[in-house]
Amino acid sequence: MRMSSGFGRTLREAPSEAELAAHQLILRAGLARQLLAGGMALLPLGMRVFRRIEAIMHAELAAIGAGEFRTPVVHAASLWEQTGRYAQYGEAMLRFNNRNQQALLFAPTHEEAVAELARREVDSYRQLPSLLYQIHTKYRDELRVRGGLLRLREFTMLDAYSLDTDWAGLDMVYDRVALAFETIFERCGVRFTAVEADGGEMGGREPREYMAFSSSGEDSLVVCPLCSYAANSEVAVRGQAAANDDVVPAMSEIATPACTTIAELATFLQVSEAQTAKAVFFNSAEKGLIFVVVRGDREVNEIKLRAAAGVSALEPATLEQISAVGAVAGYASPVGLSNVTVIADHSVVGVGGLVAGANRTGYHLQNVVYGRDWQATVVADIANVEEGDACPVCGAALSLERGIEIGHIFKLGTRYTEALGATYLDPQGQAQPIVMGSYGIGLERLLQVIIEQHHDEKGIVWPASVAPFDLHLVQLGASATVSEAANQLYQQLSEAGLSVLYDDRNESAGVKFNDADLLGMPLRLTVGERGLKQNVVELRQRATGVVETIALDQVVKSIKNIEHRA
């Protein structure tokens, strides 16, 4: 492609709204432009990267026997009503009526469509298992869009779906798809980890997220440096300390005026926050008031709490609700209370005496011991994991990392197929629900993550596997000699099967070299008057900065050798 006739342009400075380095480079390099909030247009250079990522995906999915298919992006609302997700998705779902007043929606995901397709297409166990995939558009009316391609309203995903007769079959294909996804990320040059995750509205078993390491990531990851344990902080657990069997004096009351926070209490009593018990109150539709107790230096993890309580949603309790169970806000504890659901974190069990509220304004209790002085309805891991906590697998100190979600896989089971009546006849002629799996990778997100992990102060440093072009050919000067040599090289390299970005613009050497560094092709070939006098050109590797001089008649061979070594 000749830059003189290409669509799009580079920018010297990034627009002010671009805060992340990768977002800035996407705009400066002319890969994409924002047309509306949450809607980005990919320009030709960005589209070439997009297609190369797609090609890797097609190859790896074909290698595990997946068949490509395609569903509509507009779904009937009635389909989603049957699974309960029409109401569950809330305002993130874009809903509308057609001219016949049929309720429709722009698909935020495609599980319902696949289950309905299976209902219509699959009759017998002989048609299973089956693995399908598509690379297709989705729309989610996100409350906030951010970070360029990271959180869009309209975006593209690789979605794969498995259909099996039983859970054993699902387990097998789940592992195959997981390996294919990992190969895709590796081929794209992404540093990532697979982590345990929350299933959210998708449901199912063993949800796993693929997280790309990034200091600007919006997700917090808990990773063990010694073993394979890794989890999203939303669901991460920690190893439990050995129980403290020391004899603790009897519980006693102490005056603590104006100590309504853990920090104020710890300062007043000259103890650490870890020696206190924190009371946090939530309300749920299913179980009413939930009294949560964690160690004073810990924070409640609402996702883990919802799971422990067996409720779908939580909201902060009101002062009236707290008072109704006999607790006093700011001085609360479960001591002496009954007829209330109490959920305690492991951090307040088996740790000796703690300071807790006395349920009386201005007073706390010392030497409060779980099991002796109070009981919980449920004891569970409901606090956030912190740096240095023990790994639940090997006991090593856990570390916290930042990451960007680039993929996820779920064992959906029969949630969608049962709701939509997608069954098959087993060998005995009995109808059984089809067992589903769902697997996804966000393409725009993956594109930006590649840039996030592969750039320097000058610009993008593309991995060869996904670079828009194999080579950036730079013509210095506009003399007939230079133009003829550059054009001949462009033709020879293209005929040799190399993709070439040819900078034939009437610009200075400085502008061209800066743009070459910004655009980040793996190789830069420079043709100029000085070199041609000696029948040589300059070849520079973007990643290493290594420069070599090559004879004109050896250019194609030399570049092919470099590509082979890479």
From Swiss-Prot:
Homodimer. One of its GO terms (molecular function) is proline-tRNA ligase activity. Consists of three domains: the N-terminal catalytic domain, the editing domain and the C-terminal anticodon-binding domain. The lineage of its organism: Bacteria, Bacillati, Chloroflexota, Chloroflexia, Herpetosiphonales. It is an enzyme of class 6 (ligase). Catalyzes the attachment of proline to tRNA(Pro) in a two-step reaction: proline is first activated by ATP to form Pro-AMP and then transferred to the acceptor end of tRNA(Pro). As ProRS can inadvertently accommodate and process non-cognate amino acids such as alanine and cysteine, to avoid such errors it has two additional distinct editing activities against alanine. One activity is designated as 'pretransfer' editing and involves the tRNA(Pro)-independent hydrolysis of activated Ala-AMP. This is Proline--tRNA ligase. Keywords: Aminoacyl-tRNA synthetase, ATP-binding, Cytoplasm, Ligase, Nucleotide-binding, Protein biosynthesis. Its main location: cytoplasm. It comes from Herpetosiphon aurantiacus (strain ATCC 23779 / DSM 785 / 114-95).
